[in-house]
């Protein structure tokens, strides 16, 4: 997935905000997932470890590590976008992500939910840095990662 349209200014905004958020990535990852489920409660059914869970989200033993991994991967991918010229998630991981999302029944519109949740999480995490330009930078980075995952959303071989 080409890093077209991701400018030096956007890269600087993403890097600056990610450097600030990195130290709280576990907490922010959990916030990110809680926002996804607030926006789209039905999305809970897409996660095998949440589907039939009766414990509160914060107490689900599998949610924290998953949420942190997803948040970190999303942010790290955004930071590398301009330098690499494309989404840098390893191809094998991208294929696995695509297949997993496909198998779970994730639809294209679900990525709009993750974008809203990501933007809200970042806005709350670094309010003093937040600006329309930063919002645009993170939107662009999210959209390129989402497109890369969607392009691999097919049955696994």
UniProtKB/Swiss-Prot annotation:
Keywords: Cytoplasm, Heme, Iron, Metal-binding, Nucleus, Oxidoreductase, Oxygen transport, Transport. It catalyses: Fe(III)-heme b-[protein] + nitric oxide + H2O = Fe(II)-heme b-[protein] + nitrite + 2 H(+). It is an enzyme of class 1 (oxidoreductase). GO terms for molecular function: heme binding; metal ion binding; oxidoreductase activity; oxygen binding; oxygen carrier activity. GO terms for cellular component: cytoplasm; nucleus. A motif (Homodimerization) lies at residues 38-42, 108-120. It holds the Pfam family Globin. The keyword Transport applies. Binds 1 heme group per subunit. Heme b binds at residues 48, 62, 66, 96, 100-101. Residues 5-154 form the Globin domain. Induction: Moderately induced by waterlogging in roots, but down-regulated in leaves. It is found in: Cytoplasm; Nucleus. GO terms for biological process: response to flooding. Its cofactor is heme b. The record marks 135 as: Homodimerization. Its main location: cytoplasm. Its EC number is 1.7.2.-. Predominantly expressed in leaves, to a lower extent in roots, and barely in stems, flowers and seeds. Phytoglobin that reduces nitrite to nitric oxide (NO) under anoxic conditions (e.g. during flooding or in waterlogged soil) and upon root nodulation. Required for general plant development and during nodulation, especially for the onset of symbiosis. Monitors nitric oxide (NO) levels during early phase of the nitrogen-fixing symbiosis and buffers oxygen in functioning nodules. May not function as an oxygen storage or transport protein. Has an unusually high affinity for O(2) through a hexacoordinate heme iron because of a very low dissociation constant. Involved in water stress tolerance. PANTHER family: LEGHEMOGLOBIN-RELATED, NON-SYMBIOTIC HEMOGLOBIN. Belongs to the plant globin family. Homodimer. This is Anaerobic nitrite reductase Hb1. It comes from Glycine max. The gene is HB1.
């Amino acid at each position: 997935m080409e890093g077209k349209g991701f400018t030096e200014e956007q890269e600087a905004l993403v890097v600056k905000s990610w450097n600030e958020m990195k130290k709280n990535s576990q907490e922010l990852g959990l916030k990110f997932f809680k926002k996804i489920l607030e926006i789209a409660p039905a999305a809970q059914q897409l996660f095998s470890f949440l589907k039939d869970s009766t414990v509160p989200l914060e107490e689900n033993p599998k949610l924290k590590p998953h949420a942190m991994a997803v948040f970190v991967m999303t942010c790290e991918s955004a930071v590398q976008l301009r330098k690499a010229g494309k989404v840098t998630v390893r191809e094998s991981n991208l294929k696995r992500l695509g297949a997993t999302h496909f198998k779970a029944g994730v639809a294209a519109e679900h990525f709009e939910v993750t974008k809203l949740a990501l933007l809200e999480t970042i806005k709350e995490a670094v309010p003093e840095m937040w600006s329309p330009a930063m919002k645009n930078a993170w939107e662009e980075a999210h959209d390129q990662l989402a497109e890369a995952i969607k392009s691999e959303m097919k049955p696994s071989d």
